[in-house]
Amino acid sequence: MDIIFYHPTFDTQWWIEALRKAIPQARVRAWKSGDNDSADYALVWHPPVEMLAGRDLKAVFALGAGVDSILSKLQAHPEMLKPSVPLFRLEDTGMGEQMQEYAVSQVLHWFRRFDDYRIQQNSSHWQPLPEYHREDFTIGILGAGVLGSKVAQSLQTWRFPLRCWSRTRKSWPGVQSFAGREELSAFLSQCRVLINLLPNTPETVGIINQQLLEKLPDGAYLLNLARGVHVVEDDLLAALDSGKVKGAMLDVFNREPLPPESPLWQHPRVTITPHVAAITRPAEAVEYISRTIAQLEKGERLCGQVDRARGY
């Protein structure tokens, strides 16, 4: 069994050694331009077209939760990956836990009005504020996949009203489910906090725009943990300036790194993190990949395979 590995920033040698240990029968090598030798599996992140084109692979693993970088290249270069080759993404591998930590900490930050107290502190102003009531602080999760379900589970501990929206209806205990474009407005109407965990597909690009934001309650909050292309940044800034949106926590952006001249940096109601909400944990990823390869070798049916038509 031959495995090729490519990631522009990961410690390649660590991964190769870990994979060799986890899959002793495998010959693992770092792919470099010009390497056209045979391979059974490819582990990749933002791979060059030449790495995958023409190969008879058993599967490709994207080394992250998203596969948009591969699918976008496939649109321009359909020869990059044969339609018969299964494409897998890292469904969790520790990312769910990280998303839970990020989402819960920020929801509680807003619920306890720490954002307002920070602004008061900046002007040396001492003034207790009325508390928010939990029953009126509905959390809406936009995108109900694996990570969305993890975030919902963690927020249930705090007894917030929860709802989710996705392409198809979900049956999550304690979570009100909305499905399809026809139910999006009803979903948004009660969301004091909107958490975006949508996949990056042509249908979801620019979905968080002026029209969507206007359907939220006045003074709502936005937490974007998915992709920057989901948000029309000028529309969000306008909603923040008008007070329609009271605050935004943004981990992803249309351009990354976020340019220094972006007005988001200096906006008093925006908090920025540099795409760190959920990073790939190497040891857990290696365990998932080795287990999945073993199942593929046995011909078993698996979860986590990407539907290329849907984009996730």
From Swiss-Prot:
UniProt main location, coarse: cytoplasm
EC number: 1.1.1.79, 1.1.1.81
Signal peptide: none
PROSITE patterns: D_2_HYDROXYACID_DH_3 (PS00671)
Top-level taxonomic group: Bacteria
Gene3D superfamilies the record matches: NAD(P)-binding Rossmann-like Domain
Keywords: Cytoplasm, NAD, NADP, Oxidoreductase
Localization annotation: Cytoplasm
Catalytic-site annotation from UniProt: 227, 275
Gene Ontology CC, one term: cytosol
Classification via CDD domains: GDH_like_2
Reactions catalysed according to its record: glycolate + NADP(+) = glyoxylate + NADPH + H(+); (R)-glycerate + NAD(+) = 3-hydroxypyruvate + NADH + H(+); (R)-glycerate + NADP(+) = 3-hydroxypyruvate + NADPH + H(+)
The UniProt record lists the keyword Oxidoreductase: yes
Enzyme class: oxidoreductase
MF GO annotations: glyoxylate reductase (NADPH) activity; hydroxypyruvate reductase (NADH) activity; hydroxypyruvate reductase (NADPH) activity; NAD binding
InterPro entries from the UniProt entry: D-isomer_DH_CS, D-isomer_DH_NAD-bd, GhrA_Enterobacterales, NAD(P)-bd_dom_sf
Function, as annotated: Catalyzes the NADPH-dependent reduction of glyoxylate and hydroxypyruvate into glycolate and glycerate, respectively.
PANTHER family: 2-HACID_DH_C DOMAIN-CONTAINING PROTEIN, D-ISOMER SPECIFIC 2-HYDROXYACID DEHYDROGENASE NAD-BINDING DOMAIN-CONTAINING PROTEIN
Family statement: Belongs to the D-isomer specific 2-hydroxyacid dehydrogenase family. GhrA subfamily.
Protein name as annotated: Glyoxylate/hydroxypyruvate reductase A
Biological source species: Escherichia coli O1:K1 / APEC
Record lineage: Bacteria, Pseudomonadati, Pseudomonadota, Gammaproteobacteria, Enterobacterales
GN (gene name): ghrA
